[in-house]
């Protein structure tokens, strides 16, 4: 997601929810920016959860006791599940805040604590920024941090680094070799790819996937129907998705 895109109003979401029902969509996923800065987010979730399960990817920094209570009420009133994924990139302020911003670690952990107290079991998503050999130790450090915040059996998902946006400057851009070739698709289960079964609604129309909303060629139309066609897998991010599966 990206901060240069605007929030979706409830009217816009409602229009796409109606279209999605006709197309047999079975699951909904909200990302940003930060979805919970959208003042329509709670009613959007209410209307979405009336027709299917929803997942929200949040940085966890803007929750208040009031918004958590509202979330819990919305979740409990629905027959469908509400899943929350909280992005944290380090297990302490020293490792997280240089990536996410000053003070964000403390705010995110506070958000996780409130979610757990309200009965949610958030998935903590972490972009891998460390060498492979450091993985087990870092994973254990995350578990300790989350247990200390009251999350007894934390759900943790390590994500590959996407060399897009700020990450392009922080680490490196994609190399020319990080592309999908025709040969690579032979005998490959393409259902592993995000774009094989979903589309991303933005305030500028419908894009092929959330990773490529900045790419002009990834915007496929104004409706889900228009955007449902095939897409050429020509981007570096497509290669990451190919290697790691839908993220």
What name fits each language-model region?
Residues 1-2, 244:
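Cys/His-rich metal-chelating microdomains
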Residues 2-15, 33-76, 84, 88-110, ...:
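Canonical radical SAM enzyme core domain
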Residues 32, 160, 245:
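Residues that line or immediately flank small-molecule/substrate-binding pockets and catalytic motifs
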Residues 166-247:
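Accessory C-terminal segments flanking Radical SAM cores
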């Amino acid at each position: 997601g990206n901060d240069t895109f605007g929030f979706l109003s409830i009217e816009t979401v409602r229009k796409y929810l109606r279209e999605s029902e006709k197309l047999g969509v079975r699951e909904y996923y909200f990302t940003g920016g930060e979805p919970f800065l959208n003042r329509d987010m709670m009613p959007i979730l209410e209307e979405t959860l009336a027709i299917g399960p929803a997942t929200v990817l949040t940085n966890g920094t803007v929750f208040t006791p009031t918004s958590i209570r509202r979330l819990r009420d919305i979740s409990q009133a629905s027959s469908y599940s509400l899943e929350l994924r909280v992005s944290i990139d380090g297990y302490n302020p020293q490792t997280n805040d240089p990536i996410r911003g000053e003070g964000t670690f403390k705010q995110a952990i506070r958000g996780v604590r409130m979610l757990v107290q309200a009965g949610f079991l958030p998935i903590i998503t972490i972009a891998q920024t460390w060498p492979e050999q450091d993985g087990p130790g870092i994973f254990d450090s995350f578990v300790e941090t989350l247990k200390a915040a009251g999350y007894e059996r934390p759900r943790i998902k390590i994500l590959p680094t996407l060399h897009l946006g700020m990450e392009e400057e922080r680490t490196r851009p994609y190399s020319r070799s990080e592309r999908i070739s025709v040969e690579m698709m032979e005998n490959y289960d393409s259902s592993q790819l995000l774009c094989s079964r979903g589309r991303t609604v933005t305030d500028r129309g419908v894009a092929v996937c959330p990773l490529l909303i900045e790419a002009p060629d990834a915007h496929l139309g104004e409706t889900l129907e228009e955007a449902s066609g095939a897409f050429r897998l020509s981007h570096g991010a497509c290669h990451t998705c190919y290697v790691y599966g839908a993220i």
